[in-house]
Amino acid sequence: MQISKLLYLTRALITLIIMPSFAFCSNNKQNKQVENYRTITETFVADVDISLTATPSEVQLFEGRKTAIYTYKSELIKGESSSLQEISNSYLGPIIRVKPQQKIRVRFNNELPDESIIHWHGLHVPHEMDGHPISVIKNGEQFIYEFVVDNRSGTYWFHPHPHGQTGAQVYNGLAGLFIVEDDRNDLPIKEYEVPLVIQDRRFDSSNQLVYLENNMMDRMIGFLGDEIIINGASDSSMEVKKGTYRFRVLNGSNSRIYKIAWSDGANLTIIGNDGGLISRPVDKPYIMVSPGERIEVWRDFSSEETNQQISLNSLTFDSGTMMGMMGGRRRGGMMRGGRTGGMTQGRGVMDDESNLSDSYIDNGEALTLYNFIVSDQEGEVVPLPTEFESIEQFDLSKVVNQNKPRQFDFHFQRMEWLINGKTFEMTEVAEWEKVKLNTTELWEFINSGSGRGRMSNMMKMPHPVHIHGLQFQIIERDVSQVSQSVWNSMKDGFIDEGWQDTFLLLPDMRVTVALRFEDFTGIFIYHCHNLEHEDMGMMRNYEVVE
């Protein structure tokens, strides 16, 4: 049989299997929705009170027709004016700025045609406030969040979490930064503190977003776009003064992984990650950032030449993706931010027998993310601190399962992305997913890539792993079984210190993390943060019990 025919038949078979089950995941009534139409708690006196409304809208990203998007419209009801920062000409939601231990109320209104709910990525909140898919609200309904900011200062974010629709809603624009501010006076502030939300998108000739164009392939592999969008806007560059900057970087893409580096060969100076500042600055030639992860980067432009352009790039790497009979992805060239530099070369086109086209660029291709143009203006220059606050490490002698970590195997089987052989069920919690309050455990995550059967054995992909409700410490990355080509292409790009809530699990890698379950009982979730994998069911509940 010709290769093209074999590939076409394989794709058709997968489509028949996946699509009905995916639709079932989106619409089934197994969730038995809890009562979530809450009223304001009169005894909860909020320091910051915000209204967020998810609604369809339009934004002028490019010349010509406006782009239809979803966005969070916001209103500050109570709090300092700096608590809510809008981004002009952007589809992204506002930046919410708070301080540790402040009481926060968010009145979430849904004006979307589909159900939705907000997850506060990285925040330590009660399970009712976490944005579990069971709490989704319909069009015209409201959910009121009330919680205390019980996190270190750092860069967090919020996004929708309805099962089966998370990928689509985030892709269409629903996301925003949630910054817990510090009171340090030795770091760049105001105009020198710059958010960079990195996302990849596809647009048609009418400037409209295209999602799951290659329906089955995009779901199986995860959506990959052909244009980079920074901060939800079309600008591909910004002017910087001759001063020092603090960049808060979020990988807000659905599935794309970035190997971030400076174009001039300078080291990346990393000062923070998911859980805020690390103990001291670390210099890296590049840093790996998977979907959902955050890093904080320090850069001094004070000695650069006027009009010099320095770019933030993503370097090439081997992701270890193996798709078996489904075939690999066609390799393209450089993708640049903005329409005029969009990638148009290297797109694979199937023959007439399949009538399928491939318009994507592999994970691991070289990309230009954003350009910085050094102006002739002198800016504020702040010396780089030699250290920040120390981070208390878990006492592993007090871990309750020190000699037998819980194991979670992320793999492909029966045409599904699974965890320990199971898919997501709205209320199910297996016995091996129940943990005791006020205990510390070790969890070992394994990317075996495959379950049973020949097709499964050929399916390998990296998975960004996210755990709700807490932050953890990475204890070990076992790379002994990881392909040498894969590991050598990114081995210098990991910072496994400090507090994290998301990490990259490469094919054949094992990662052990230490977690402490405190303050709250209830059901939380853990999942692959490749949003298409998550929507397909690569997500499970865990329950904290007394």
What name fits each language-model region?
Residues 2-12:
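Bacterial N-terminal signal peptides that target proteins for export
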Residues 18-19, 521:
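Residue-level signal for mature regions of secreted extracellular proteins and peptides
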Residues 21-24:
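C-terminal motif of bacterial Sec signal peptides marking the signal peptidase cleavage site
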Residues 28-300, 320, 327-411, 493-497, ...:
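Histidine-centered copper-binding motifs that mark active-site loops
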Residues 29, 61-67, 73-79, 122, ...:
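Active-site pocket scaffolds in enzymes
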Residues 113-116, 257-259, 307, 453, ...:
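Short acidic/proline- and small/hydrophobic-mixed sequence motifs that coincide with surface turns
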Residues 148-154, 300-306, 516-522:
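Short, surface-exposed loop/turn segments at beta-strand-coil junctions that are enriched for proline
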Residues 156-162, 307-319, 524-528:
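Short, aromatic- and glycine-rich surface loops/edge beta-strands on solvent-exposed regions
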